[in-house]
């Protein structure tokens, strides 16, 4: 790897220096902070960090939330099609110290990723965390957490910098929609919302270009009271989005397949910060489909088109994934990597599934409750 030296840049115009540094990966710039005060000041500038996030080559790492801890993962699939076994390993814990907890250990129950920032729900509240720079912002909430509370991290898209915000709502018949602005360090109530949709309790949201997306269902208000118990789990019908610039829920996004049963498995993921991806498995046939949106270049996405990425019949393996499954798409190797909880297993399990009925099962570590694997992009974003 080429080493950057401050002396090499001393004769260059400052604008050119900024442009060069804006194209260097975040993890490399992190090591340069102590070499030059002027560079360190630049790396803390919001306008530069936005330019860097837009221009720099993205590094895609894999993290996993397990046992209330965020850990790094090593995932090497390069020799997959040359009959070389993949390498999968859970590495060390990422250090996140809770100043409000006597044990100092932070117990993280949920994670939401956006632009290199992690919004973590903990036992004592919320924290926005940049693992690359080790910055944290601990956020007070007015009332104790409700297990139905949903939080999302996103940003208003402005020319000079990103205005990061947290959206909170409680998925009830009606709720107060709340916004926390990172810049002002304050909460505000947007108003009471009576939605015509519901988001399943175990549905994990994802961020794409500053907006948040969830799998959602129609409100079944026509269901008779005596039928409610049978229809406790509604059929997932569409995606719902939240636009952090307009601070409104967006239009529904149609799914590329038809759910016939509430037991069908659906999960949502993001592919290389460019597209959304859907995991679908039919409960009856066990056939699995992976769909991806076509490239999204605009912040406001009122319509999306979908293309199939992978279709596999898992009936031979007799395996049914649950809705808590998390997955990553590897476009180069034409496979997906899934992490699922096995009721009768003593370990967390990773599955690699690909074309020509490629199927590989890897036990990684001792079993945890609903492990969640996700892609992480290091950034210099300031909080």
Swiss-Prot record:
CDD domains cross-referenced by the UniProt entry: F-box_AtFBW1-like
Record keyword Repeat present: yes
Record keywords: Kelch repeat, Repeat
Organism whose genome encodes this protein: Arabidopsis thaliana (Mouse-ear cress)
Entry protein name: Putative F-box/kelch-repeat protein At1g62270
NCBIfam families (alphabetical): F_box_assoc_1 (TIGR01640)
UniProt keyword annotation of Calcium present: no
Domain (F-box): residue spans on this chain: 6-51
UniProt repeat feature Kelch, residue ranges: 110-158, 160-211, 349-383
Superkingdom of the organism of origin: Eukaryota
Coiled coil location: none
């Amino acid at each position: 790897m080429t080493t950057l030296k401050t002396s090499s840049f001393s004769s260059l115009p400052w604008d050119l220096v900024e442009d060069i540094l804006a194209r260097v990966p975040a993890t490399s710039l992190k090591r340069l902070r102590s070499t030059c005060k002027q560079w360190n000041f630049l790396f803390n500038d919001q306008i530069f960090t936005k330019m860097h996030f837009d221009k720099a080559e993205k590094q895609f790492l894999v993290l996993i939330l397990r046992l209330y801890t965020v850990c790094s993962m090593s995932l090497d699939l390069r020799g997959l099609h040359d009959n070389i076994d993949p390498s999968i390993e859970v590495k060390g814990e990422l250090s996140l110290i809770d100043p409000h907890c006597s044990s100092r250990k932070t117990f993280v129950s949920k994670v939401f990723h956006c632009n290199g920032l992690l919004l973590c729900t903990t036992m004592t509240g919320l924290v926005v965390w940049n693992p690359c720079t080790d910055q944290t912002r601990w956020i007070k909430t007015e009332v104790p957490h409700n297990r139905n509370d949903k939080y999302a991290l996103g940003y208003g898209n402005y020319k000079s910098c990103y205005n990061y915000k947290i959206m909170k709502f409680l998925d009830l018949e009606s709720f107060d929609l709340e916004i926390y602005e990172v810049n002002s360090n304050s909460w505000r109530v947007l108003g009471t919302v009576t939605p015509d949709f519901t988001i399943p309790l175990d549905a994990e949201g994802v961020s794409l270009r500053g907006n948040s997306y969830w799998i959602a269902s129609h409100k079944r208000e026509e269901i008779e009271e005596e039928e409610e118990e049978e229809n406790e789990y509604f059929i997932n019908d569409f995606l719902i989005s939240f636009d952090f610039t307009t601070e409104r829920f967006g239009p529904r996004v149609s799914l590329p397949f038809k759910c016939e049963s509430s037991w069908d498995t659906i999960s949502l993921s993001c592919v290389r910060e460019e597209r959304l991806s859907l995991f679908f498995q039919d409960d009856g046939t066990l056939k699995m489909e992976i769909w991806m949106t076509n490239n999204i270049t605009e912040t406001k996405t009122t319509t999306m088109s979908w293309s199939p990425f992978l279709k596999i019949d898992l009936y031979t393996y007799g395996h049914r994934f649950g809705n808590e499954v998390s997955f990553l798409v590897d476009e180069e190797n034409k496979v997906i990597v899934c992490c699922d909880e096995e009721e009768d297993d003593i370990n967390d399990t990773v599955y690699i599934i690909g074309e020509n009925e490629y199927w590989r099962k890897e036990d990684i570590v001792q079993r945890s409750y609903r492990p969640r694997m996700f892609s992480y992009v290091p950034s210099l974003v300031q909080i």
